[in-house]
């Protein structure tokens, strides 16, 4: 869980900015949105399979694009 220590000379805005940065780095908001509604295991596997295919096609596209430049 993110947390910061506020120094006496630190303003509220600065402390808030540091806290928001930690929250963004830890992907807390993204995970909370993903867990907002229950997702069945079959739906999760389906999404993972689609994401893996998309990633593989992107790598293949980039590889072919790189090879065509040689």
From Swiss-Prot:
What gene makes this protein? rpsU
Name it.
Small ribosomal subunit protein bS21
Gene3D superfamilies, per the entry: Ribosomal protein S8
Which superkingdom? Answer: Bacteria
Which Cys pairs does UniProt list as disulfide-bonded? none
One biological process term in Gene Ontology? translation
Entry keyword Ribonucleoprotein: yes
Q: Which organism is it from?
A: Nitratiruptor sp. (strain SB155-2)
Q: Name one Pfam family in it.
A: Ribosomal_S21
The entry's cellular-component GO terms read: ribonucleoprotein complex; ribosome
Q: What is the lineage of its organism?
A: Bacteria, Pseudomonadati, Campylobacterota, Epsilonproteobacteria, Nautiliales
Similarity field: Belongs to the bacterial ribosomal protein bS21 family.
HAMAP family in the cross-refs: Ribosomal_bS21
One example of the protein's molecular function in GO is:
structural constituent of ribosome
Alphabetized, the UniProt keywords read:
Ribonucleoprotein, Ribosomal protein
Q: Which InterPro entries match?
A: Ribosomal_bS21, Ribosomal_bS21_sf
């Amino acid at each position: 869980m993110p947390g910061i220590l506020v120094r006496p000379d630190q303003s509220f805005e600065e402390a808030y900015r540091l806290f928001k940065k930690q929250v963004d780095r830890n992907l807390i908001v993204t995970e909370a949105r993903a867990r907002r509604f229950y997702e069945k295991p079959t739906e999760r596997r389906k999404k993972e399979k689609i994401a893996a295919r998309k990633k593989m096609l992107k790598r293949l596209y980039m590889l072919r694009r790189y090879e065509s430049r040689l």
